Structure formats: C-alpha cells, structure tokens
Amino acid sequence: DRSVSRGLGDVYKRQEYYKEMFRNAPGIPISKHLNIRSAAACYSSSQLAVRMASLAGARLHVLHVSTAKELQLFSDAPLEDKHITAEACIAHLLYRQQDYKELGTRIKCNPSIKKQADRDALRNAVNTGVIDVIATDHAPHLLSEKEGDALKAMSGMPMIQFSLVSMLELAEKGIFSIETIVEKMCHAPAQIYGICNRGYIREGYQADLVLVSHGERWEVNTENILSKCGWSPLEGNSFRWKVEKTFANGHLIYLSLIHISEP
C-alpha cells in the first residue's frame, strides 16, 4: 500500500539522510531521533490502519499514538460505541523534545518523543475521550544497551514501577483527574481487550488492587528501583504519591518496595 510505503520509506530516507550528514561525526545526535521516526511517518501508518479498518468494518485498537495530527483519526464517542480505539504511552504524556537534552538516549523509544505541542495535545485527548487507554510500553533494556547514537541505542525504557505515581503526579498538577486515570489504566483496557472479571472493583471480580498513599515527597533513585535493569528515566523525580501494596487475584504480591511473590 502507498501509505505503508510512505511511512516506512520516510523513516528509511531520513535515516540515510542523517547517516550521510553525520558520517564524519561520532554518531547521529539523539535529538534527531524524532526527525527520523517522524510525525509524518506516524500519521501515515495510523491513517492506513484506520482507513483499512473503516473499509472492512473491522475492530481496531491503535497503539502508541504520539502526535497531535494522529488524533484527528479518532473519535471522542463513548467507548462502548467505538470500533476504532487509541492508546497513548506514559512516556509520550510525560516527555517532549526538550527532554532529549537532559535525558538523551534514556528516553529513546518508538514512536519517538515528539514536540511539546504533541504532548499537550495527547494530554487533552486523554481528557476528552479521544485517547481511550494509557499504557506503559515497558521495555527494560540494560543501560549498556541504551548507549550509542540515535540509531545504535536500543528503543524503549522501563516504565511499569512508577507508571501509576507518574500519572497521579499529573493529577496533582490538575492535568488529569484521578477518575480519568482509573478509567484509562484499569476500566478501558479490560473492556477493550475483553478481559473478564477484571479492571473494576466489583463483587465477584478478581481482586487486582493497588493501595496508594499521599504524603511527603520521595525521590526515585537506584536504591528503590526494583526492575532488574536497575535504572529509570524518572531517576531524580520526586512524588508525593506512593504505592504501598499491590494485590493480584486477591494475593498480596508487593509491600513497600518488597516483591513478595508471583500471583
């Protein structure tokens, strides 16, 4: 399909363009990642998927929407009335182009982190119902795998452990309501994927629960990171929200930074 060719071709052509531009340099700067994995390529890919699903009358869930323009492809109708739904990742709700300067390849992911206008549009789309799900896109690469330039560094970052507190921090800033966070991270995923007896606190449902507290600020550092990769792009960030306990199927599996058992 021409749309696929345009999307993939755009990435390849831009990749080759920057290889040539920086052939006498140590590597391609990470700041060029969003130019290689461009907004145009994202839109072409999503547009094709939505068009094909619409023509076929098929059910479609689009992952990792990262640009303002892509949001035009989706509806703000109630979830139960949609045949085409959309998801945004926490990284794209937190970071923007300027953050490459400080965090470098730590925030390299696919799709790439885009401009602040894209991030702000995604946040608004969460609130208006255009974005149906918030996901982690958890990819716990080792720091050694994140080394290199815009092409060599692995894409993805560990996001599960601090995903909820990150979103609750945005709620504290007035960006989302707590109810919206619960809807996008619990209710909607269960409904969209048809996961029975989960996603809600209801009698007869599996008790998958998280107990959080709100108090003094604490800081993410290597001592409280539980992921085996041993790092987080959120190191140095502080939060007032804290996960105290996690239950899966009614069993306590996490208690104050202690991983107890598998569910």
What are these regions (language model features)?
Residues 60, 87, 137, 167, ...:
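Residue-level signal for inorganic ion chemistry
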Residues 3, 69, 117, 184, ...:
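Short, conserved clusters of charged catalytic residues that mark active-site
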Residues 71, 94, 142-144, 219-220, ...:
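Glycine/Thr-rich phosphate-binding loops of Rossmann-like dinucleotide-binding domains
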Residues 149, 203-256:
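C-terminal cap of metal-dependent C-N hydrolases
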Residues 1-12, 258-263:
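Single conserved hydrophobic/aromatic residue that forms the stacking wall/gate
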Residues 6, 10-134:
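Histidine/acidic residue-rich metal-binding segments in metalloenzymes
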Residues 27-57, 106, 125-128, 132-134, ...:
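His/Asp/Glu-enriched, well-ordered alpha-helical/loop segment
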Residues 67, 91, 139-141, 216-217, ...:
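Short, glycine-/Ser/Thr-/acidic-enriched flexible segments
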